[in-house]
């Protein structure tokens, strides 16, 4: 089974702002380019899941349009299944605030307890890992799946593959790599099992 982890296109937000579940649109042209690039590559029979945030849903809809109108592929299995477990982490009160305006003390507390601390008051990395692990466990055992999602969710998948739900000892344990906006990563399960 192949899991396609697709990151939404660049969001239409000022550089340097904290956003996780802040529901902002993605750049329409960048979304179209991503859909044009990925749609022909998606396997027949794949199931499409997307975050509940509009920047992910825009890409899911653009992929559907590419398959239907350009490629003339009527794969009704690629109707998107909205799954809020694929939403980005929620930064609570810090959503929409410039990163450099968030007090250093808030970052210090978060990095000292990166696993459990709810940065912004709503969701911890542990909470994110648990919901992403649940979404992974609910994937079909056969066929391929496509997740239209966010960098934090993709990092969570990569962490779960390596460590399972083991608590993060430090913030440095958290993966820093994620696909760039409008790109993707494919994982073969059988090679990568979720603990």
Show where each model-derived region lies.
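Acidic, low-complexity terminal tails and accessory targeting/binding regions
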Residues: 1-2, 69-72, 89-101, 141, ...
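Active-site-proximal alpha-helix that buttresses catalytic centers in soluble enzyme cores
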Residues: 2-72
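Generic beta-sheet signal
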Residues: 3-4, 46, 141-152
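Generic structural signal for well-ordered alpha-helical scaffold segments
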Residues: 35-39, 129, 133-141
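Short beta-strand scaffold positions
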Residues: 50-51, 130, 148-149
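Active-site signature of alpha/beta-hydrolase-fold catalytic machinery across serine-
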Residues: 62, 156-160
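Phosphate-handling substructures
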Residues: 66-131
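GST superfamily/GST-like fold recognition
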Residues: 151-155, 185
